[in-house]
């Protein structure tokens, strides 16, 4: 009881990974015992009518894969797979007439070779980094650069244009407001009020 319950957490992750292999066993369904069998597990103890085994094979069994004795007599089928990848356990659902308590510790169970999956299938695959693409990078880096240059050119021209306006040379040419710009800048306004402005008004009269 404790073994089965204690490993249910691990079983969840394991089961999710191995369900892909479950469909594979259905594709290769065969009648009768296989021609050859390989060692799959060693008996540990019975649990709720099932057999709990420690895997002695480097590969992982399919769910529902038939399990045999060495003489190819079928004992049952793989029911659950437990534990981490480096220490795999599994349970056997006994067939009709087979008692889990009739086995002793160390008894071996067997499986057909086509009911096994390589353990590498369940290991995380490293990310493959592709070769750099210098052509694409050059195009990408060149486009923003050109844009930046154009933007700077626009910014520069605006700055210069505004500077001219602020300096009153252009504005003055347009509507005489250069004198205002200059007057705001300092001495010219005072002078214009004191002299030029008065003289000009006098001239108009």
Swiss-Prot record:
<dbReference type="InterPro" id="IPR007504">
    <property type="entry name" value="H/ACA_rnp_Gar1/Naf1"/>
</dbReference>
<keyword id="KW-0687">Ribonucleoprotein</keyword>
<feature type="region of interest" description="RGG-box 2">
    <location>
        <begin position="147"/>
        <end position="205"/>
    </location>
</feature>
<feature type="modified residue" description="Omega-N-methylarginine; by HMT1">
    <location>
        <position position="184"/>
    </location>
</feature>
<feature type="modified residue" description="Omega-N-methylarginine; by HMT1; alternate">
    <location>
        <position position="154"/>
    </location>
</feature>
<feature type="modified residue" description="Omega-N-methylarginine; by HMT1; alternate">
    <location>
        <position position="147"/>
    </location>
</feature>
<feature type="modified residue" description="Asymmetric dimethylarginine; by HMT1; alternate">
    <location>
        <position position="147"/>
    </location>
</feature>
<feature type="modified residue" description="Asymmetric dimethylarginine; by HMT1">
    <location>
        <position position="201"/>
    </location>
</feature>
<feature type="modified residue" description="Asymmetric dimethylarginine; by HMT1; alternate">
    <location>
        <position position="158"/>
    </location>
</feature>
<feature type="modified residue" description="Asymmetric dimethylarginine; by HMT1">
    <location>
        <position position="193"/>
    </location>
</feature>
<feature type="cross-link" description="Glycyl lysine isopeptide (Lys-Gly) (interchain with G-Cter in ubiquitin)">
    <location>
        <position position="77"/>
    </location>
</feature>
<dbReference type="Pfam" id="PF04410">
    <property type="entry name" value="Gar1"/>
</dbReference>
<dbReference type="InterPro" id="IPR009000">
    <property type="entry name" value="Transl_B-barrel_sf"/>
</dbReference>
<protein>
    <recommendedName>
        <fullName>H/ACA ribonucleoprotein complex subunit GAR1</fullName>
    </recommendedName>
</protein>
<feature type="modified residue" description="Asymmetric dimethylarginine; by HMT1">
    <location>
        <position position="19"/>
    </location>
</feature>
<dbReference type="GO" id="GO:0034513">
    <property type="term" value="F:box H/ACA snoRNA binding"/>
</dbReference>
<feature type="modified residue" description="Omega-N-methylarginine; by HMT1">
    <location>
        <position position="180"/>
    </location>
</feature>
<feature type="region of interest" description="Disordered">
    <location>
        <begin position="124"/>
        <end position="205"/>
    </location>
</feature>
<comment type="function">
    <text>Non-catalytic component of the H/ACA small nucleolar ribonucleoprotein (H/ACA snoRNP), which catalyzes pseudouridylation of rRNA and is required for ribosome biogenesis. This involves the isomerization of uridine such that the ribose is subsequently attached to C5, instead of the normal N1. Pseudouridine ('psi') residues may serve to stabilize the conformation of rRNAs. The H/ACA snoRNP complex also mediates pseudouridylation of other types of RNAs. The H/ACA snoRNP complex mediates pseudouridylation at position 93 in U2 snRNA. Essential for growth.</text>
</comment>
<feature type="modified residue" description="Omega-N-methylarginine; by HMT1; alternate">
    <location>
        <position position="189"/>
    </location>
</feature>
<feature type="modified residue" description="Omega-N-methylarginine; by HMT1; alternate">
    <location>
        <position position="8"/>
    </location>
</feature>
<feature type="modified residue" description="Asymmetric dimethylarginine; by HMT1; alternate">
    <location>
        <position position="15"/>
    </location>
</feature>
<feature type="region of interest" description="RGG-box 1">
    <location>
        <begin position="4"/>
        <end position="21"/>
    </location>
</feature>
<comment type="subunit">
    <text>Component of the small nucleolar ribonucleoprotein particles containing H/ACA-type snoRNAs (H/ACA snoRNPs). The protein component of the H/ACA snoRNP contains CBF5, GAR1, NHP2 and NOP10. The complex contains a stable core composed of CBF5 and NOP10, to which GAR1 and NHP2 subsequently bind. Interacts with snoRNAs.</text>
</comment>
<dbReference type="InterPro" id="IPR038664">
    <property type="entry name" value="Gar1/Naf1_Cbf5-bd_sf"/>
</dbReference>
<dbReference type="GO" id="GO:0031120">
    <property type="term" value="P:snRNA pseudouridine synthesis"/>
</dbReference>
<feature type="modified residue" description="Omega-N-methylarginine; by HMT1; alternate">
    <location>
        <position position="165"/>
    </location>
</feature>
<feature type="modified residue" description="Asymmetric dimethylarginine; by HMT1; alternate">
    <location>
        <position position="154"/>
    </location>
</feature>
<feature type="modified residue" description="Asymmetric dimethylarginine; by HMT1">
    <location>
        <position position="171"/>
    </location>
</feature>
<dbReference type="GO" id="GO:0000454">
    <property type="term" value="P:snoRNA guided rRNA pseudouridine synthesis"/>
</dbReference>
<feature type="modified residue" description="Asymmetric dimethylarginine; by HMT1; alternate">
    <location>
        <position position="189"/>
    </location>
</feature>
<keyword id="KW-0832">Ubl conjugation</keyword>
<feature type="modified residue" description="Asymmetric dimethylarginine; by HMT1; alternate">
    <location>
        <position position="8"/>
    </location>
</feature>
<feature type="modified residue" description="Asymmetric dimethylarginine; by HMT1">
    <location>
        <position position="4"/>
    </location>
</feature>
<feature type="modified residue" description="Asymmetric dimethylarginine; by HMT1">
    <location>
        <position position="162"/>
    </location>
</feature>
<feature type="compositionally biased region" description="Gly residues">
    <location>
        <begin position="143"/>
        <end position="205"/>
    </location>
</feature>
<feature type="compositionally biased region" description="Gly residues">
    <location>
        <begin position="1"/>
        <end position="23"/>
    </location>
</feature>
<dbReference type="GO" id="GO:0005730">
    <property type="term" value="C:nucleolus"/>
</dbReference>
<keyword id="KW-1017">Isopeptide bond</keyword>
<keyword id="KW-0694">RNA-binding</keyword>
<feature type="modified residue" description="Asymmetric dimethylarginine; by HMT1; alternate">
    <location>
        <position position="165"/>
    </location>
</feature>
<keyword id="KW-0698">rRNA processing</keyword>
